[in-house]
Amino acid sequence: IYKWNGNEATATRKDVFTEGPWCVHGCTGTEITVVANAESQILVQCTKNEKDFGAKLYKPEDAPWGYSCVGKFGNVAKRRVNTIFDHDISPKSNMVLGEVLNDRGNWSGYLPHRHPQPETYFFKFDHPEGFGASFVGDQVFKSTDESFSAIPGGELHPQAVAPGYQMYTCWMIRHIDGNPWLQTDRCEDERYTWLHDAEF
């Protein structure tokens, strides 16, 4: 149960792989209470922001999943993506919040791309031994269940999941003052853009 500003909402999510997200988003000074009636996991994202805006509840229907890259790059970069809030949805926020579900053995954040705003990924897998690879610039880190990847602004950051496993990623971006992240700001590495027109 979420409680904020005299409002109350009951939220349930069996798991991140089959059901959509619930989120209460508020500005500095908003008191949000969470009452768990069963064992639960809550992800808290926060940053400094002096702007005032009204708190809002986002339900699963507010952040529908949409497939990306179906049929492209040999059909191995398929993933479902949602955006819970970004600059277009909540222009006074200093954050972006969304989710990705990689199909088994597929890539996300592909083609390799960068943006000046820093980003954090939080990973979950549909089996506890599941794993993937998180590329941050020229470094590669093993992604495991409930691990995270901290991506400095300006670094390329594609991700991949091992065959047989589905990977969930909660992606969180912090706007730069005067330079918010926008959906149109995706800057792909020019070395790989030829793949858009390649046939496999």
Question: Where are the model-predicted features located?
Answer:
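Short, conserved beta-strand element in jelly-roll/cupin
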Residues: 1-4, 100-104, 115-143, 150, ...
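Acidic, low-complexity central loop/insert segments
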Residues: 2-63
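Generic detection of short hydrophobic beta-strand segments and adjacent strand-loop junctions
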Residues: 9-11, 141-144
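Conserved metal-binding segment of the jelly-roll/cupin
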Residues: 17-37, 47, 142-164, 170-174
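Short, structured patches in soluble enzyme cores that scaffold and shape functional sites
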Residues: 28, 36, 44-48, 85-87, ...
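Secondary-structure boundary elements
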Residues: 33-39, 91, 126-130, 139
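Double-stranded beta-helix
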Residues: 39-80, 96, 135, 170-200
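A short glycine-rich, His/Asp/Glu-containing loop-to-beta-strand
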Residues: 71-120, 131
